Amino acid sequence: LPKSKGGKLPDDLYNIITDEEKRKKLVVYINPPYAESGSTKKRDAKVGVNESMIHKRIFSKLSSYSKRELFAQFLARIYIEIPNCKIANFSTLKNLQSSYFSDFREIFRAKLAKIFLAPADTFDNVKGKFPIGFFVWDSNINEKFHEIIADVYEKDGEESIERKRIFSYEEGKYINDWLRPTWNKNINEI
């Protein structure tokens, strides 16, 4: 609702969102929160950070890891509350590939229209050697993610000749499924 009707949304923004023609030109730049609730063996790690309105409304029924991720809640909320929009974000690939995000992929069914990858250490204060994906989603098209071909960029910004095929692995076994039966808990190794 707009502020003039007791809501939190500025009236001008509300008018744009509710007008189909104006909404086509709307671009919202938001830095989604990247935090995850949980605990470690030694200490609590941001316990309760996931307790949001969207968590209670949508993710409370799920029993997966994805509901602990604020960026997943953020994407789901945009998808549900601002229909028929384009969403762009950057993150790791876990929302596409992780078995923990299969429940999220059931809810968030915007078509992944385009993705490109860059090394994580391209960003300030990131030391890891893993890809960061720049995603463009189209919520006009209801489609569960299964796979896509991504362009790959090097740290210097040059496009690599390599392209990467990214899967959701919904039907396949993960490496842990293969390793778990051979794991020896007494000596903590395979």
Task: Locate predicted features.
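Carboxylate/His-rich catalytic cores and anion/metal-binding grooves
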Residues: 15-35
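C-terminal substrate-recognition regions of SAM-dependent nucleic acid methyltransferases
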Residues: 131-190
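Short, solvent-exposed loop/turn segments at secondary-structure junctions
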Residues: 33-37, 94-96, 140-142
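Conserved S-adenosyl-L-methionine
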Residues: 1-3
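Conserved Class I SAM-dependent methyltransferase catalytic core
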Residues: 60-120, 135
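A short acidic (Asp/Glu
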Residues: 38-41, 97-104, 126-130
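Short, surface-exposed amphipathic charged segments that create phosphate/polyanion-binding patches used
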Residues: 10-12, 127-136
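A mobile, often basic/glycine-rich helix-loop segment
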Residues: 34-67
